[in-house]
Amino acid sequence: KFMKIHRDIPEAVAKICAQSDVKKFIQVSAIGANENSKSLYQRSKFQGEARALTNFKNTVIIRPSVVCGTEDNFTNLFSKLSILPIIPVVGINYKFQPILVTDVADAIVKAIEAKNNHGKIYEIGGPQIISFGDMVKSIVKTLNKKRFVVEMPMPIAKIQSSILSLLPIPPVLTRDQ
């Protein structure tokens, strides 16, 4: 599904833009988009960017960090997991710059209004660099709960994601993530 959503759809939209009277196409991608990534997600994002840029010269790419807001999957996942006394986290010390969805929207508006930015790639993040573990602790604290946030070893996470992928419901995290 990554390839269809991240690569094929941006390509199709860019082709439609090229055939129409569209002035600019803003493609929202993701920080870390890279053609050589081990992650299918990151490779598919990069390929979508490349195809959009190839098929419509007036494309602008925006690569946000993890996007947070009232209905986002990220914070809501850990809100749901806060029913557990212990919250396992893969990559507990991984640092990132979460960004509010409203700030992403502002960046999109600025990209639309900007002159001479065709073909540009903008990487955007929030003002704070935070570890994944500290972010989860912050979410739990906001909910006025006390939970233990612990590191889940990668081998266990891979086994868990493989098992969850067999269920008829979408997994919380894919093996690629």
Where are these regions (language model features)?
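Mid/C-terminal beta-alpha module of Rossmann-like enzyme folds, strongest
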Residues: 111-176
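Short alpha-helix in the Rossmann-fold core of NAD(P)-dependent oxidoreductases
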Residues: 2-7, 26, 45, 97
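NAD(P)H-binding glycine-rich loop region in Rossmannoid oxidoreductase-like domains
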Residues: 1-12, 16-19, 31-35
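Substrate-positioning beta->alpha
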Residues: 73-74, 91-113, 120-123
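Conserved cofactor-binding/catalytic machinery of classical short-chain dehydrogenase/reductase
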Residues: 9, 24, 47-48, 100-103
